Amino acid sequence: GRDPEVLPPGPRGLTGPLRVGIDARELQGRPTGTGRYLRNLLRVWTRHTDDAFFAYFSGPAPDDPALATDRVVERPLRPAPHGVLWQEWRLPDAARQDGLDVFFSPAYSCPLRLDIPRVTAVHDLSFFGWPADFSLVDGLRRRLLVGSSLRASTRILACSDFTCREIACLFPDVKSR
């Protein structure tokens, strides 16, 4: 990774390289499907764009080959007692300091307190269709956060046609994003 000071501050017009923030917590710990998705996106983006990527972590950044490029700035932030608190309090403040142009959330929910364009990836909405597969608190948290995040996002990446149809059905107000 690279130090934030060596990259020029944003925001800029969309004609030059972007400063892209990423909620990179999915790269920490044991790899998940979303973590592998993010790792592959980072590999492609750092090879095929001139953009700078700021990868935000709750605690130390992992030793991950996808981060081993001068185009990725590792931003380990102090953990919070709960992931939602980290996402809504620690992350937005750090993202503002970094002068980002856009923020990418690879796992269903984005920081609602950010005031820059957000792009949120949604892999499925199983917590709506099969609520019994989730604890009461986790299912409720996911259902509340995904709706708010989709409404706050400038763009939504539905990772399958089925998920796109689910989003259009459950959240018709955001289906054009």
PLM regions: where:
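Carbohydrate transferase catalytic cores enriched for Leloir-type hexosyltransferases
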Residues: 2-177
